[in-house]
Each structure stands twice: as C-alpha cells, then as structure tokens.
C-alpha cells in the first residue's frame, strides 16, 4: 500500500478547502515516500508557511472563509489519519491561526469573529473546534502543546480591548481558577507587545482596565492571594492595583445588582447564549449594556 493510501484515505473533500489542499500537498511530498519518515519536523514548516502566507494579509472576509474551511475540514472532510498525524496536523494549524490572531495581529474584530464562528463548540474543551481553549506559542515555535491559552496570553499582554471581548463571551466565567487570570494581570512582568495591526498602548492603563473588567465578571477576587505573592517578592505592574478592585469583591457584601448580573449571565452561559442572548432580553438598553460588561 502506498504511503499516501496508508496514511490518509480521502473519500470526499472539497477541492477548494484550504486545509484539504494543504494536506494533499504534504501527502504528495517526494521527501516523505515512506511512512517511517513522517515526523513533526517534516511537515510543520510547510503548514506554518502556507497558513502564514494567508493570515499575514487576510481581511475579515478572508479570515471568515479560512475558519469555515477549518470547521468543514474537521467535521466533514472524511479524511482518515493515523492518530498521531491527525493530532499533529490539527495542532499545527490551530497554533498557527491563534499565533497570528492574538500575537501578531491583535485585532479585536478578528478575535470576535473567531469566537462567533466557534462558539457552538466552546462547551467541549476537548473539541478541536473549540479554538479558544487550545494552546499556542506566542513566540512562534512548533510546540503548541506546551503553549498557553488565548485568555492567558491576553492577560499577560493586557490587551484590554480584546480581554473585554473574551469576557463578554463568558471565557473568564468558564475558567476553573479565574484568580490566576487576575494574578497574571497584576503580576506578570511587562514586556514589549509586537503587533502588526495594533498600535502600542500604555500597558499600565490597559492593566487597570483589565482589573475593572474582572470585577464586572467575578463575585470574589482574592486580594489575600495577591498580597501573598507580593510578600514573596513579586512586583505588581501597577503600584495602586488595590484601587481597581472594589471592596465588595473581597471584604464587603457583594452588591445585589452585581449578583443579579452574574445570575443572568450564568444562565445565558449555560445555554451558550453569551453575548447575543443579552440583546434578546426585553429590558432597557442600559441594563443590556450592564449585562454585557459595558458599565
């Protein structure tokens, strides 16, 4: 049996699909005539270069088409791989997509489109289409399994406009230990943010905004845990971080209005209706904005 037949059986896949075409090119490479030669290092550069060439200059419509192709590839392409290659191929593709969206472009419109296109899969963290839970390497290298999630990366870089979008879609509320995100915002060392589509902003002001946004999503923020980290010698990125966490998140009783917001958002989150479901509620626009973390 030939290498391509043994590795991959194709029964039905649109010829125009970016990922199907990319796979065809990899399978047909003369240098990979024998199955034993297959390895991550053999095909990762080709996958990255092919997708990077698209993602470097892609507009929103083009990115929409790319995501549509990826979803179709995973769901309907009917490719059958060896398990190890299937994992490698999808992880390289996801790593490349997330790297360009979050680390290179830093464009809120691209992030929101990614969330909209994949929101139906977000409740299953193990799904290859739940891109927001996948890891990527911010300084690109072919090791996506050792990377970080988009939420942690955005917390590290304090991209407040993108952080807000992630929170509006309920990503922080789905976190098992949200205090880790708060700790990252307050304590993660400052670093230069290299962006293509985004001007450099004041990272200190962004950090303050991110803390305020966290207080709109969480009912409790452990100030004690932050102080414990400070006692171990860690330094906060903003000296007055304490001023941006309301006392009702760590000491005083939580506001009833805020608890109502959390309850409604949690119900919408359970039904995978954030944030669009907010605007179908028959309530005043100001309350809709409150639920959507605008105020």
From Swiss-Prot:
GO terms for biological process: intracellular signal transduction; protein ubiquitination. It holds the Pfam family SOCS_box. Pathway: Protein modification; protein ubiquitination. It comes from Macaca fascicularis (Crab-eating macaque). The lineage of its organism: Eukaryota, Metazoa, Chordata, Craniata, Vertebrata. Gene3D superfamilies: Ankyrin repeat-containing domain. Keywords: ANK repeat, Ubl conjugation pathway. Residues 232-295 form the SOCS box domain. Belongs to the ankyrin SOCS box (ASB) family. May be a substrate-recognition component of a SCF-like ECS (Elongin-Cullin-SOCS-box protein) E3 ubiquitin-protein ligase complex which mediates the ubiquitination and subsequent proteasomal degradation of target proteins. ANK repeats lie at residues 146-176. The SOCS box domain mediates the interaction with the Elongin BC complex, an adapter module in different E3 ubiquitin-protein ligase complexes. SUPFAM superfamilies: Ankyrin repeat (SSF48403), SOCS box-like (SSF158235). This is Ankyrin repeat and SOCS box protein 17. InterPro entries: Ankyrin_rpt-contain_sf, ASB17, SOCS_box, SOCS_box-like_dom_sf. The gene is ASB17. It comes from the Eukaryota.
């Amino acid at each position: 049996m030939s290498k391509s037949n043994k590795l991959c059986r194709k029964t039905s896949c649109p010829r125009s699909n970016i990922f199907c075409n990319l796979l065809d090119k990899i399978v047909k490479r003369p240098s990979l005539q024998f199955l034993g030669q297959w390895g991550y290092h053999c095909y990762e550069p080709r996958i990255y270069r092919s997708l990077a060439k698209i993602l470097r200059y892609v507009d929103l419509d083009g990115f929409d088409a790319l995501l549509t192709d990826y979803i179709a590839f995973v769901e309907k392409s009917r490719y059958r791989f060896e398990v190890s290659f299937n994992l490698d191929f999808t992880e390289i593709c996801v790593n490349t997509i997330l790297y360009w969206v979050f680390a290179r472009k830093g464009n809120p419109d691209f992030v929101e489109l990614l969330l909209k296109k994949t929101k139906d899969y977000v409740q299953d963290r193990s799904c290859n289409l739940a891109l927001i839970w996948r890891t990527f390497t911010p300084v690109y290298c072919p090791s996506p399994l050792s990377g970080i999630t988009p939420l942690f990366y955005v917390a590290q870089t304090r991209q407040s406009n993108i952080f807000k979008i992630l929170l509006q879609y309920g990503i922080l509320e789905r976190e098992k230990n949200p205090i880790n995100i708060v700790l990252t915002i307050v304590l993660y060392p400052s670093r230069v943010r290299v962006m293509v589509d985004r001007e450099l902003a004041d990272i200190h002001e962004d950090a303050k905004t991110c803390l305020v946004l966290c207080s709109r999503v969480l009912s409790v923020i452990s100030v004690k845990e932050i102080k414990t980290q400070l006692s171990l010698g860690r330094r906060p990125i903003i000296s007055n971080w304490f001023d941006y966490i309301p006392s009702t998140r760590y000491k005083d009783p939580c506001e009833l209005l805020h608890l109502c917001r959390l309850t409604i958002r949690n119900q919408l989150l359970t039904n995978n209706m954030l944030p669009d479901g907010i605007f179908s509620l028959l309530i005043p626009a100001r309350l809709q904005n409150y639920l959507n973390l605008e105020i």
